[in-house]
C-alpha cells in the first residue's frame, strides 16, 4: 500500500447543495470527472458553491472553451492522460501509507439533513476482504 490520497465518491444524483457540503467538509481540491459534468461544476463555482475545488481532471478530451471557462472561476482543467504522463515522469518516491490512513470517505444520501460521511481506513478495507 503506497498511495496516501483519499477518494470521495460524488454521485450525479446528489444536488448542488450536497456536493457543496461534501467539498467544503472534506476541503476537496480536485475532482476527477466526465465531460458531461464540467459545466455543472463551473456553474456551482459561479454560484459560490464548491469553493475548495481548484482542479478538474477529465476522463474525456478537454474542449478549449471549457479550459477557459474553468480558468474564469479559478479551476485548472486537464485531461486524465496528462495526469498519467506527469506521474510517469515523476521520480518522487511514494510515501508509504499507514493502516490508519483514510483511502475512502463514503457519504450517504443524507435522507435526514446533510450527507453523512464515513471515514474508512486501510484496516477497515482489508478486514472486509
How should these model regions be labeled?
Residues 1-2, 20, 87-88, 111:
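Generic signal for short, ordered secondary-structure residues
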Residues 18-21, 124, 128:
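Well-ordered alpha-helical segments embedded in enzymatic catalytic cores
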Residues 25, 101, 128:
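Acidic active-site catalytic centers that drive phospho-/nucleotidyl reactions
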Residues 103-127:
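Conserved AMP-binding A3 loop
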Residues 12, 92, 116-118:
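Flexible, active-site-adjacent loop/turn segments at secondary-structure boundaries
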Residues 2-82, 97:
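Structural core segment of the AMP-binding/adenylate-forming
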Residues 58, 76-78, 85-107, 114:
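Conserved pre-ATP/AMP-binding loop-to-beta segment of ANL
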Amino acid at each position: 500500500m503506497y498511495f496516501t490520497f483519499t477518494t470521495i465518491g460524488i454521485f450525479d444524483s446528489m444536488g448542488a447543495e450536497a456536493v457543496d457540503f461534501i467539498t467544503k467538509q472534506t476541503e476537496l481540491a480536485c475532482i476527477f470527472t466526465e465531460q458531461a459534468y464540467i459545466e455543472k461544476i463551473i456553474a456551482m463555482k459561479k454560484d459560490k458553491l464548491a469553493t475548495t475545488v481548484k482542479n478538474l481532471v477529465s476522463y474525456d478530451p478537454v474542449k478549449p472553451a471549457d479550459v477557459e471557462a474553468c480558468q474564469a472561476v479559478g479551476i485548472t482543467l486537464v485531461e486524465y492522460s496528462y495526469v498519467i504522463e506527469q506521474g510517469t515522469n515523476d521520480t518522487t518516491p511514494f510515501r508509504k501509507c499507514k493502516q490508519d490512513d483514510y483511502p475512502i470517505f463514503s457519504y450517504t444520501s443524507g435522507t435526514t439533513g446533510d450527507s453523512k460521511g464515513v471515514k474508512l481506513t486501510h484496516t477497515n478495507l482489508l478486514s472486509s476482504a
